[in-house]
Amino acid sequence: MILEKNFIQPVVETDRFTLRPLRRSDQGLIEFYTKDERVARMTTTIPHPLPPGATEAFIDRSLSEDREEDIWVIDGIKSEFSEVVGLISLERLNQTQSELGYWVAPAFWNKGVASEVVRFVSDMNPMKNRTMFAAVFQDNPASARVLTNCGFDYISDAEAFCVARNSSVPTWTYLKKYK
């Protein structure tokens, strides 16, 4: 049995949520939510249909000592939501840059979850980067609004491959600079 470890990834609190490292016990809810095509289609990496073992492998990678990405569960227990509402992540691009990613389960859409946690993590800047990037698919304007409302500036159009769609999808790229 593999023990759970937390390698200097902080547990932090927003007004309504606890952002914490993944636990193996999160597997069922993460798998349930990511099997939803509406979630998978708005990410680059979640396949649809979700193959057996994918969530367990994802959790294993997130708990690895040599990971390049910090992933937090958006835990909604203190707001009487689910223990897993979604995920938010920061991937180290280099020593001065990171890329923000997130998804929220459809049951919690339009409740301010993404806005609250994106603002919190981007303001906290836990990797102490000079710049933080984020990209959203152009058919997801709600996520674009979240980013602009949280202080990110639009910088360009691009494309990213979406595993669930099995195609390249137009994106908008955003940047937040720190002093």
Regions found by a protein language model. Give the residues of each.
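Short, hydrophobic secondary-structure boundary micro-motifs
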Residues: 41-43, 71, 99
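Acyl-donor (CoA/ACP) binding surface of acyl/acetyltransferases
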Residues: 1-37, 75-179
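A short helix-loop-beta-strand connector motif used in the catalytic cores of GNAT acetyltransferases and
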Residues: 60-73
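Juxtamembrane/interface motifs at transmembrane-helix termini
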Residues: 49-53, 61-63, 105-106, 138-140
